[in-house]
């Protein structure tokens, strides 16, 4: 696919568009969390468990990712486990720790809610050239790293 001409934009316009996207996503996360019977924080934690795949995270890993205390993440995991979203498994290398695994049926339920939106995003990506997709991927990856670093430096839980 050849790149379509795109309108010129300044960094300020791009940041404004990004702010609009983030705001819309925040509203969407609240709506989706309600649909699946979770809080936004619990849904975010579950998403990190899914993202980890076979590399099962510990409670400490999740606390760091969600930027909550280990005590708070215990409550999150208790709610997720009671609701059938996760299972806690003993850590094979450290008996004091547990690993967190997503329940396959819960993963399927959450993906079913997101699937129509991701299909639309896939259609949108199809309107861009491979080089443009590479730029988008690079920008999202670097912006995610920057955001995580900023959170680490400025927003640590007590």
Can you describe what each PLM-predicted range is?
Residues 1-6, 133-158:
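C-terminal regulatory/oligomerization modules of transcriptional regulators
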Residues 1-36, 83:
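N-terminal leader segment of winged-helix/HTH proteins
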Residues 17-28, 45, 113, 120, ...:
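C-terminal ligand-sensing/allosteric alpha-helical core of TetR-family HTH transcriptional regulators
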Residues 29-68:
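N-terminal helix-turn-helix DNA-binding core of bacterial DNA-binding proteins
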Residues 71:
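Key DNA-contact positions within bacterial/archaeal DNA-binding proteins
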Residues 79-134:
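Charged, amphipathic alpha-helical coiled-coil/dimerization segments
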């Amino acid at each position: 696919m050849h790149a379509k001409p795109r309108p010129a934009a300044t960094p300020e316009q791009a940041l404004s568009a990004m702010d609009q996207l983030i705001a819309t996503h925040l509203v969407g996360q609240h709506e989706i969390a309600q649909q699946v019977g979770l809080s936004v924080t619990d849904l975010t934690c579950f998403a990190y468990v899914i993202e980890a795949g076979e590399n099962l995270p510990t409670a400490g890993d999740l606390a760091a990712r969600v930027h909550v205390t280990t005590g708070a993440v215990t409550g999150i995991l208790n709610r997720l486990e009671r609701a059938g979203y996760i299972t806690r498994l003993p850590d094979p290398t450290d008996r004091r720790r547990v690993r967190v695994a997503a329940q396959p049926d819960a993963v399927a339920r959450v993906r079913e809610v997101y699937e129509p939106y991701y299909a639309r995003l896939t259609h949108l990506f199809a309107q861009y050239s491979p080089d443009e997709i590479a730029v988008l991927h690079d920008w999202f990856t670097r912006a995610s790293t920057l955001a995580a670093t900023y959170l680490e430096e400025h927003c640590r839980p007590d």
